[in-house]
Regions:
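Catalytic cores of enzymes
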Residues: 1-167
Length: 167
């Protein structure tokens, strides 16, 4: 399930490059580690790129374009509160991604720590590479943090939520 990566760092992580990669690169998993904001008002919902904001409508359009040719198996939104919604849209950016055609989205329920999240993601991806289903990989990454003295507090392991298909 783990693809050969195509990576956009810093100034390469532009609105144009991100949307082009999402359209053209046949990855089954896309990992976006950035900052974002969610609101039930689409104009106030976005992910941050190097050169500005990737509006939720753009993300929605790009994901819908992939549905027939190359549907996205897993979209990882490694940013604060990507699965936290409001009274009008309860699943936040993660829910929008599912409605737009991603089979599954991994999001967060609250503000996350960059260092611990990077370590958590390594464990999650190691679990996927070992052949675990998405939900199992999530659970086992959480359990490994729960058993770690440094990251046993729920702040570090509990914000991650899988929305959509769990297998």
């Amino acid at each position: 399930m783990v693809d050969t990566p195509s990576i956009l760092f810093n100034e390469q992580f532009t609105q144009r490059n991100v949307t082009q990669k999402l359209r053209d690169y046949p990855a089954s998993i896309v990992h976006l580690a950035t900052h974002g904001q969610f609101s039930s008002d689409a104009e106030k919902t976005f992910l941050l790129a190097w050169d500005g904001q990737i509006n939720v409508r753009t993300l929605d359009q790009v994901l819908k374009e992939r549905i027939t040719l190359n549907p996205l198996e897993l979209l990882v939104l490694s940013a604060c509160q990507t699965a936290q919604g409001d009274e009008q849209a309860i699943l936040g950016l993660a829910g929008i991604a599912i409605r737009s055609g991603a089979h599954s989205t991994l999001g967060t329920l609250w503000t996350i720590n960059d260092r611990s999240t990077a370590e958590w993601m390594v464990r999650f991806y190691q679990n996927l590479a070992a052949g675990q289903e998405k939900a199992e990989a999530l659970r086992n990454a959480q359990l490994s943090f729960l058993q770690s003295p440094e990251y046993a507090h729920p702040y570090y392991w509990a914000p991650f939520i899988l929305v959509g298909q769990w297998h």
